[in-house]
Amino acid sequence: IDVSKGYPVIKPSRDGLQVKRQETMNVLSGALSKHQRKVPVPVAAIKPELTEADIGKIIVIRKKEHTLYLYDKEDLFNSYVIAVGMPQYPTPNGRFHVTYKEKNPTWLPTSEWAKDKRGIPQPPGPDNPLGGYWMDIGSGLGIHATPYEGTLGEDASHGCIRMASWAAEEVFNKVKVGTPVYIID
């Protein structure tokens, strides 16, 4: 999946190559004793783990636009206004995937910025900053609902992707664990 243009382009899958280690060691051993400078490297073809048929929903987050785009393969399903990380807690660029999902999550703040709430579980409810929907994307980051909908369209989070409750619910119900998430400028 290529998102360099800001939207997903699915590239055809193809076989890869894997070096045959033991055969390569044997070839190298023989080449060294004969002072050969060039040797063939024995390889085996391997099938791709993921093919075009395996791809479903794709999330692309464009931070400068404060927008999350939900695609069904290459077709845009919907777009949503979001909040991303503040300058001192930037949302990182990169390729992620949904590692788990939780409805009505408990928030357990572990970062220094949580101050007096650090280490104290915040149960589901109106005071929970994760809102009613959490989609973990690894590295302590997530896409989640927020009770602070006035911050949408701004750099306002501590690195996570904040969404309106209705939007987070829609995305939560459309994606599954393993859904790719691309965060770009």
Name each model feature, range by range.
Residues 1-120, 124-127, 149, 175-177:
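Surface-exposed, secretory/extracytoplasmic low-complexity segments enriched in Ser/Thr/Asn/Gly/Pro
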